[in-house]
């Protein structure tokens, strides 16, 4: 550059089908130069991000996801350390268990309320409980309601049969086909559950889901 200034460079990486940002970072590191080495704690962190966003490699995990994971393992990512890093406390575990225990099955949808008392991040626990409900045979999608800070947070999950994004969009939210959410205000949990049921009924009648 004539003025002697170094121009800024930007790398734009757009992969809508990537499992996570951590996968893309690992992929860039892998090919940015030969024989690159990263610290084990950095590898652990990136690996943990992939594990979280893919729900233990069960959601949106493609061949390149596993290639990124293999690269991180070669660079010191330790699955035992990562597992310990991702463990929750007893209150979180009990809350998830209560959410699953009290779930209602409505037209192949598992609906439940996640208790928020005593939890540091109740909305995260609610999302984790929604994932757990998909492990039940016959459940096409799950929606967990978490009341926190005067707002009802909806965490919707599915595997491949229901586009939960469409349901959440009807409720003012959004997301992706298998992972979506919404927020409801100025109503009780009972009214929120009734609203979701009516939305499911309406969309099924319309053939929208």
Question: What are the roles of these predicted feature ranges?
Answer:
Residues 1-7, 11-12:
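Single conserved hydrophobic/aromatic residue that forms the stacking wall/gate
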Residues 8-9, 33, 46:
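A glycine/threonine-rich phosphate-anchoring loop and its flanking beta-alpha core
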Residues 26-31, 70-74:
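Short glycine/serine- and small hydrophobic-enriched flexible loop segments
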Residues 27-28, 39-52:
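Internal alpha/beta core interface subdomains
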Residues 27-39, 57, 201-203:
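A charged, well-structured terminal subsegment
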Residues 47, 52-209:
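Hydrophobic helix-and-loop "lid/oligomerization" segment in the mid-to-C-terminal part
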